[in-house]
Amino acid sequence: MNIMAHLIPVKCSRFLAGIIVSLVAGPALAGEINTGYFGDVAIKGYDPVAYFTMSKAVKGSEKYSHRWLGATWHFSSPEHKKNFQVAPASYAPQYGGYCSDGVAYGQATANIDPQAWRIINGKLYLNYDPGSAQELEEVDGQLEKAEANWPEIQKKLAAK
C-alpha cells in the first residue's frame, strides 16, 4: 500500500478548504482590520495562530510577517506564518480585531489588549481588557449582540 497516495489527497483537501474559507470570509473582513491608532500591524504584533496552537498570547516577529487585508500580521515562527497564509480567516480575530465586548455595545473600540482574549466555538475574540473578555464569555447573549451589531459597525468603518 502506498501511504503517500492517501496522504496527498488529505493535504490537498485541507489546503483547498483553507482557500475556500479565505475567499468566503475575506470579503466580509475586507478593509476592517483593526491596526490601532498608528501603523498597520494587526493585533499589536501578536501571533494570531499562537492563540490556537499554544493557548496563549505570543508576540510575533517582523521577521515572520505577512500582508493580508491591508494589515501586516506578525508570527512567532515560520510554521505559524505558513498556517495563516493557507487559511487566514481561520486564525484572524472576529470583528476585524476590534474589542468584541465593545462591538456587543455597538462600538468599534480600537484599543485592544492582546492578552485579553477568548476562543469561543473555535473563533478568536480580542478585547479591551480582561474584564471585557470575561463579560463577553459569561454574560448571556453578549456574543449574539456583537454578531447583530457587527454589520452596522462595518458600514460605519467603511464610510470613514
Predicted regions and their residues:
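Bacterial N-terminal signal peptides that target proteins for export
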Residues: 2-19
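Generic low-complexity segments that are intrinsically disordered, proline-rich and/or Lys/Arg-biased
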Residues: 7-10, 28, 152
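Charged, low-complexity intrinsically disordered segments
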Residues: 30-160
